[in-house]
């Protein structure tokens, strides 16, 4: 199962880009031994359409091109679930992998958010809470959660779980 983070907008050089790259590299390295041959970070250009709904629709069409037939779409959106813990997410990732799904595509919208068509197609919609976060940090956090899911599946000590 390929892992793909597809986000609208470009991360500028700086600490967020470096940290996102670090988590992507870690996930790619660890994932190879767990049935995840690659982890890609794809940047979709922001639409230049005049109206926000048109921008969202254009960006959704571009994001959808990265979802292969049978792939899993997970969206980060302000209306998403903030109550799914890392271990539960890891279980879902493992289930999708074990069902021989070809790819897990995690999407992050642009400044106007995600189009309803992406939210409708998504098998899981997540949120990092009610607070508004900078786009670059959301990307870092999404990649960190992918990496954390893989460490949980590998039994790696990075994730220590809940205190018993």
Swiss-Prot record:
Chain positions recorded as S-adenosyl-L-methionine binding sites: 109
GO cellular component: cytoplasm
Annotated Pfam families: SPOUT_MTase
Family matches, as InterPro entries: Alpha/beta_knot_MTases, RlmH-like, tRNA_m1G_MTases_N
Subcellular location: Cytoplasm
Gene Ontology terms for molecular function: rRNA (pseudouridine-N3-)-methyltransferase activity
Protein name stated in the entry: Ribosomal RNA large subunit methyltransferase H
Organism: Methylobacterium radiotolerans (strain ATCC 27329 / DSM 1819 / JCM 2831 / NBRC 15690 / NCIMB 10815 / 0-1)
Designated gene of the protein: rlmH
């Amino acid at each position: 199962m390929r892992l793909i983070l597809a986000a609208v907008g470009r991360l500028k050089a700086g600490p967020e880009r470096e940290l996102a790259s670090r988590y992507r590299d870690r996930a790619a390295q660890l994932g190879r031994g767990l049935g995840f041959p690659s982890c890609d970070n794809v940047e979709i250009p922001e639409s230049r359409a005049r109206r926000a709904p048109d921008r969202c629709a254009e960006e959704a069409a571009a994001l959808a091109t990265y979802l292969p037939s049978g792939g899993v779409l997970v969206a980060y959106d302000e209306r998403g679930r903030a109550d799914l813990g890392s271990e539960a997410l890891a279980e879902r990732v493992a289930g999708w992998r074990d069902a021989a799904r070809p790819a897990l595509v995690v999407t992050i919208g642009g400044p106007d958010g995600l189009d309803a068509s992406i939210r409708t197609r998504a098998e899981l919609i997540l949120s990092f809470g009610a607070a508004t976060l900078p786009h670059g940090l959301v990307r870092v956090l999404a990649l960190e959660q992918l990496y954390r899911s893989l460490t949980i599946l590998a039994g790696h000590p990075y994730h220590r779980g809940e205190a018993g």
